[in-house]
Amino acid sequence: MRRGLLLLNLGTPDNADIRAVKLYLREFLTDKRVIDLPTIPRYILVYCLILPFRSPKSAQAYQSIWTEKGSPLLYHSQNLVTKLQSALKDEYKIALGMRYGTPSITTALAELKDCHSLTILPLFPQYSSAATGSAIEKTLSYLANQEIIPSIKIIRDFYQRPEYIQAQAKIMKPYIKDNFHVLFSYHGIPERHIHKSGCDTLCPQTCTPIYDKNQACYRAQCYQTSLLLAKELQLGTHQYTTAFQSRLGKTPWIKPYTDEIFAELISKGIKNIVVSCPSFVADCLETLEEIGIRAKEQWEKLGGEQFILTPCMNDHPEWIKAIHSIVNEQI
């Protein structure tokens, strides 16, 4: 009997025109785990305020990174599946499901319907309800309606796994030069999501080490990721900074904000930076456009000189080896 491996990621529009982007954003932003408001206020916010104004801007952003192969997130993810299947051979049958857009989680699970056991790996190193939680919920809701439910294993997060840290560090290392400051930029989430994760307090600066009460805290996991990467890369505490990007709306999101940390770094005399985005395993809008284009322009306008964005792990051989190890340890 065959084992199934379901890889989950967030998703991408089918193409970069306004209509496709609007459809994608509608599915994404009406998710109750993403915008955690009651249904009616959430729909009013999304349909009346966000979609009419954000869709054209987002479409323009997607167009700036779209390639002949299509969406970078999608083709990197598909390449990962192909290479991982080749590496794992008959150990697993692998399918890719996107929480929003295509290929859908439903389609991916249909591909794995003959598997007697299923390992679910959301490709989000750090746990958040809005990304990991939503993808797992969608998967389990589909499985709950099946006549035969396979044995299920869920890998909730893997930020602390040595294989992930080593793979991320190996990809970063060639880009780190003398006199360059390293910025770890993670996707942000609203502060209220932190309180919902079980944390009693929101740490004013760096988060405390992981313990029982903050083990599901996204911000704490991000800071722990930075600490582990810095150790692997042999960076001193003064050689790197952690920040959070991609905030939406006017409510407080976890800090410090990536777009506000640049001025602080410049004021300290830092002119050259290497930026890595460890919460993203594949290059996408948030890495290529938000950081690779807009953040770089901002850095240069502030007087910064060199700005290097390291690639995500994408379908790198070290990442494939890491997934193989992480998945097999769950058996």
Curated annotation (Swiss-Prot):
Enzyme Commission code(s) on record: 4.98.1.1
Matching InterPro entries: Ferrochelatase, Ferrochelatase_C, Ferrochelatase_N
Subcellular localization(s) per the UniProt record: Cytoplasm
Catalytic reactions of this protein: heme b + 2 H(+) = protoporphyrin IX + Fe(2+)
Pfam family, one: Ferrochelatase
Known function: Catalyzes the ferrous insertion into protoporphyrin IX.
Protein name listed in UniProt: Ferrochelatase
Species for this entry: Legionella pneumophila (strain Corby)
Recorded name of the encoding gene: hemH
